[in-house]
């Protein structure tokens, strides 16, 4: 097979597993509902993209949930499959996506999927360990390019990047919190059970719907930067081999 044709086919296949467009569309549905002052609809839209209970959330908590989801999934929904695609092509990218999807479906700590879910969660933690950190660093640069507070993003990243039950999720959430001068994290109800969590970032100002838009901008800029970095590494590898 022609190598350029193979690359084109693999790129098209991998495009299907990148969550960039989906994340933006679903989070902006929450944003639109909030701008329309329809908290009930915003809660419902948020419930489509988060695992926490949303029925009793305030406007600020709904906004925070959307921001956290976009920030976290920038790493495991975009940068991770992109990195694995550059390492092992479509097969490795799809293998990663399978692990990530399994974690999303059964990785919660409930009695029904306790052991299988624990295995899925540990696999996902392992698979996302490097991508999450790459995403965090790229997002700090993205914050600078978007004229956000990159210095604060770096500070909160260093301080709060482990303030999460997952070893990876706070990598990009901490950068987002610092860049936007907001506080993320904190406990929530999952399946009717309260789960305490540490906060991420400083409570400098109230979270507002426009932060969803800014987080999407961060997500896209981080994705572009990551593509450039991975492509440069790939080209250097080809040059070395030749």
Where are these regions (language model features)?
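Hydrophobic alpha-helical transmembrane segments
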Residues: 1-94, 107-242
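Active-site His/Glu-centered metal-binding helix of metallohydrolases
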Residues: 98, 102, 106
């Amino acid at each position: 097979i022609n190598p350029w044709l193979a690359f084109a086919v693999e790129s098209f296949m991998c495009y299907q597993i990148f969550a960039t467009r989906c994340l933006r569309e679903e989070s902006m549905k929450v944003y639109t509902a909030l701008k329309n002052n329809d908290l009930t609809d915003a809660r419902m839209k948020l419930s489509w993209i988060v695992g926490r209970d949303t029925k009793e959330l305030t406007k600020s908590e709904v906004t925070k949930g959307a921001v956290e989801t976009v920030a976290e999934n920038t790493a495991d929904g975009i940068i991770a499959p992109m990195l694995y695609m550059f390492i092992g092509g479509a097969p490795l990218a799809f293998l990663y996506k399978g692990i990530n999807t399994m974690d999303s479906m059964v990785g919660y700590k409930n009695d029904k999927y306790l052991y299988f879910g624990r295995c899925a969660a540990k696999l996902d933690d392992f698979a996302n360990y490097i991508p999450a950190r790459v995403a965090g660093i790229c997002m700090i640069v993205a914050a600078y390019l978007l004229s956000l507070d990159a210095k604060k993003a770096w500070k909160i990243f260093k301080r709060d990047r482990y303030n999460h039950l997952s070893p990876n999720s706070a990598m990009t959430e901490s950068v987002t919190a610092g860049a936007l001068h907001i506080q993320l994290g904190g406990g929530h109800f999952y399946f009717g059970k309260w789960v305490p969590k540490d906060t991420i970032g400083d409570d400098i100002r109230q979270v507002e719907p426009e932060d969803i838009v800014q987080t999407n901008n961060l997500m896209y800029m981080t994705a572009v930067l990551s593509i450039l970095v991975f492509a440069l590494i790939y080209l250097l590898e080809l040059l070395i081999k030749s």
